Amino acid sequence: MHNLADIIAATNLYNCGDYFQAELICTKIIDTQLDNSDALCLLGRIKYQLSKNQIASTTDAGLRYHLWYYNNQIWNTTTWAGVKALKSPCDMWNYQEIIWDLKPSLILEFGSFFGGGTLFFASLLEKINNKSQVFSVDIDHTSLNPQVRNHPRIELMLSSSTAPQVSQRIVELRREFPGPIFAILDSNHEKQHVLGEMQLLRPLLQTGDYVVVEDSNINGHPVLPGWGEGPYEAMEEYFAIYPDDYQRDDLREQKFGFTFATAGFLIRR
């Protein structure tokens, strides 16, 4: 009965346009009752309205597209060679241009998931560098496509991306595949984890190496306001400690009008 009264109160707030208070009530209900269909349904309607209002409030074409593309989860349908990639095609095109120019011998990917991105990077390496490898790290490989598991240019590690064995293996791979590194951070998006990834890479990278910090668009940069501190805030803290480590590649970030890697295209100094 308590939840029913809360649902009625949240619905009344929603109908009055007070979406934030309605969202707060629904979230509290779901925290204690994950399968409450009324709260889940109303929360979906609230998020749709918030997204719609956010898009309507801006005249920036790139921002409008970013919000539409992200909030409608079009990114969740993107694939490479039939394998889910979960990325922005604009970012992927940017990556291939960066990789073609950089010609890395080693690509580091923190966060494999289905493996579409992993396969994409391996496909690029086949075109540009005879002696090269993708090293992809994730805590769970159960969703990986067989194409990824069996690819000769892909090495997988089942581990947290901040674990010491990851650093040790990168040192070994750097000896085996000398040359530039392209690294992409796309695993756990919580601030402290991303900060740990950046700190792990700090002694391993050389001048000219390239790092992309993905999903720094969350927590209101510009999507998912209120998500909590994530990659963007991790970069802010990192640069407060090490202000001279990287140069931001603003031209790349701005090239297509929007990116999932807000402020996250970085060249090692």
Regions found by a protein language model. Name each.
Residues N3-L4, S37-D38:
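Helix-start (N-cap) detector for alpha-helical repeat units in TPR-like alpha-solenoids
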